[in-house]
């Protein structure tokens, strides 16, 4: 009887410790089927007050998100590849990234930035590579031009994209 209790306790504890807690959006060329939309998913999560980690130089700059049904569903809707990770898998990845022998870093993202793109009025998204990419990725942005700059409206944005 004691053996059965110990066995089921072991199985239960193993199941709890290996439960899914994170979603990895891989960004390497072989694992991600829609890179641009993956950026959009990350922005969407930040906009919904989830925190994300950008795993620089890990599998193409992957994103680590909390596991939530609505995130999984949104990934499926947008055609974004994702992997479900347990706590122990997440710890292994973060330990690898933090190793002094690796050129990697984990950057915590906490807030969706308000984005402005410096572009003339009346342009269609496909007229400009940046607006095309942001539109396709479903990342909201505001087109601004000289009038807004002269009216001191740059202060309203966290990120300004200028063409070079």
Where are these regions (language model features)?
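Boundary at the C-terminal end of the N-terminal hydrophobic targeting segment
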Residues: 18-20
